[in-house]
Amino acid sequence: MVNKFTNLGFLIVITLILSQCANKGTTSGGDKDVTPPVIIKSTPENFSINFDAQEIEIEFDEYVKLKNLQKQLIISPPMTLEPEITPVGTASKIIKIKIFDTLQPNTTYAFNFGESIADNNEGNLFPYYKYIFSTGTYIDSLSVSGMVSDALNKEVDERVAVLLYEVDSSYYDSIVYKQKPKYITVTDSLSGFKLENLKEGSYLLTALKEENPNYTYQQKTDKIAYRKQFISVPSDTAYVLRLFKESIDYDFKRARQASKNKIAFGYEGEGTSMRIKILSEVPDDFSSTITKEIDKDTLNYWYRPEIEVDSLLFEVRHLESIDTAVVRIKDFKLDSLMFKPLSSKLKLQESLLISASTPLGKFKASKVQVMDKDSVFQTPTMGLDASLNAVVLDFDKTEKNNYSIQLLPGALTDFYGVENDTLNYKVATKLQSDYGNVRITIRNGVYPLIVQLTEAKGEEVESQMITEATPVDFKDVNPGIYSLRVIFDTNKNGVYDTGSFLNKTQPERVSYASKPVEIRAAWDTFEEFVLED
């Protein structure tokens, strides 16, 4: 009997232990912890003045971890020597900040941790915590706020850096390229910003969307926005900054032999003003032509006849800029003449373009035949598009038809006198009812205007310039949802012009209709866009 009671007691104890162990591991044994961590103390205290410490400790009531600190943490003013902040990759009850930089006198510093602090167990955020101190006798408390928009596109980049440069005796016009700002913040989810803990003074207000964040402007990769006039702090103004990508400054890079009788001239920026001249001695029958590579910042200089030399000397001009280039000449092969149609689906009023790998010289329409699916033949009209180095074929088309295009030998001749072999291509048209049309009426326009349909990311689909109050018709548009954009063409050149920080010019004004435009197949749509002042 005693043994039975002993065994029973042992089983009860074991059962209780196992039950407690099981409860510790269950996910249904109580409410989920949603309480964020709490700061117990900070050493030195937050909002300290006369700060001269080299290390800061922030102690929490539970273990915390730092997530995505490099992206989330904003230190304002920025430090030349980055501080060391722990824990990294592990959890701790204490966040430590070791300062290595020499702190500026009488300056308020702010460490904004964004959404980087979370408890270790449930990941509850301790959002937008700021540790603030002053090396002077008081904490600066002034602020500046506003919004950032994109000058051209409807959508605005996330986490745009907004910067203030103090305008004092050390300020200079190109400071944004070389020095970090006095104060920094980033835009919130609604593209708003607020720069806090500022001291009274005059400032340059800018914004940057950086490819590689370092708070200095890199023209090739970054977007910039700026306020043309300096701002004064304190200020009650809500500032609006329009972010834009500058046109890259022209820079000649290099010249190299790409193939026989072909020299490639690489550059950055605007290349339409480039002029290339050969300085080496050439024969009397020497001839040359230049084409631009599609989607590349390269001009190809083609010449004939072949010159038996070790090198060629060129002069490259661009407005007031003059460069010279020496190109070593090797025994390369001549480029083969090859062709590629730029589309296999054509609208009824659309031309067929066939691009060539070498410069086109002559064409013979009599050696080109077009046949539809009913074996009806026609001879197209032909032309050359120098910008694409392509032949342009125009012929009568009907809806829902297939066309076979044959170019017989000698239909096309390139710069070197090489003729095409027989070429065969097939293209097709769709039903007219597969497309939609839209008529757009602009109200309150200040002309000229460029009216555009764009896709979601701002890519241009249709575009038309108008110089007076007249409806804009976009016909045979693929069905879909589009945005309606109007560019105020201030300089009347028919294209959107971006801004320049150094030249102190802002990008041309752009307005988007508040509602998207839906293009439906076999449907005529009518839209009215009232422009605001």
Residue positions per predicted region:
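Acidic, low-complexity Ser/Thr/Gly/Pro-rich repeat segments typical of extracellular/periplasmic
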Residues: 2-5, 21-208, 220-226, 248-262, ...
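Sec-dependent signal peptide recognition
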Residues: 4-13
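Structured interaction patches on ligand/partner-binding surfaces of diverse proteins
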Residues: 127-128, 209-247, 325-337, 416, ...
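Intrinsically disordered, low-complexity terminal regions enriched in Ser/Thr/Pro/Gly
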Residues: 437-439
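Charged regulatory segments coupled to nucleotide-binding catalytic modules in large multidomain enzymes
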Residues: 445-446
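Short, surface-exposed loop/turn motifs with a glycine/proline- and acidic-biased composition
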Residues: 478-479
